[in-house]
Amino acid sequence: MSAKTTPKGLKEVTYNDAVARSKEYFGGDELAATVWVSKYALKDSFGHIYESSPEDMHHRIAAEIERIEKNYPNPLSRDEIFALLDHFRYVIPQGGPMTGIGNNLQIASLSNCFVIGHKKPADSYGGIFRMDEEQVQI
């Protein structure tokens, strides 16, 4: 895919434009803006950027969550979901989900981390081996 060809319905934005718009979103915080653009903005596998601020990302995530919500009784609307995400007020997705939810341009993990453990104490040889077995299965 060349820089002139964009995925259907998406508009490519420059890094500088995305940083400028994100800096506004983050109240002038350049570090937050550059980190967001570098790590979490929607990109294709060539590094082309398709979101210019976390607001765009929140719309993407809200659209995908709404798609799933429709499978259940009393689903939240896209606007309700967006309101929960907007400005990271009530729901703050972790890095992997921010990058991956609704991202059809790259394969991304939706999990960040998880806890392993055993009901029994792990401070014995047997407990250590049980932990090792769990880690191998990951």
Role assignments for model-derived ranges:
Residues 1-138:
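Extended catalytic cores of very large enzyme megasubunits
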